[in-house]
Amino acid sequence: MLRTIARIDFLSIAEQFARRVKSELDADADVYLFGSFARNDANEHSDIDVAVVSRTFGKDISEDYGKLAVLAHHVNPNIEAHPIVFDDWINTTPFTNEIKKDGVLL
């Protein structure tokens, strides 16, 4: 992690990222905070894991990661953004199960 994030700041950072995703990429995307911050067991080395579920993802997953990485970097370099193809969200994978279990919809 590039810097320590105060416990109060992480939700605000994730919400700011969600607003940018919805305004710049996909207004209908669902954005979830997941991982250690969502489970409330983050430490000074934790990044902010955010999943973006969108029907626009899937044609080129590398491009999807790239778009999210650019947005994430502009909001906070500690954000680790993960594009989720809508079909994977519906059909459920081990990764999406983790997000559904512990994730917080922003």
Residue map of PLM features:
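Short hydrophobic/aromatic beta-strand micro-patches
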Residues: 51-53
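Catalytic core of pol beta-like nucleotidyltransferases
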Residues: 1-30, 38-44, 55-106
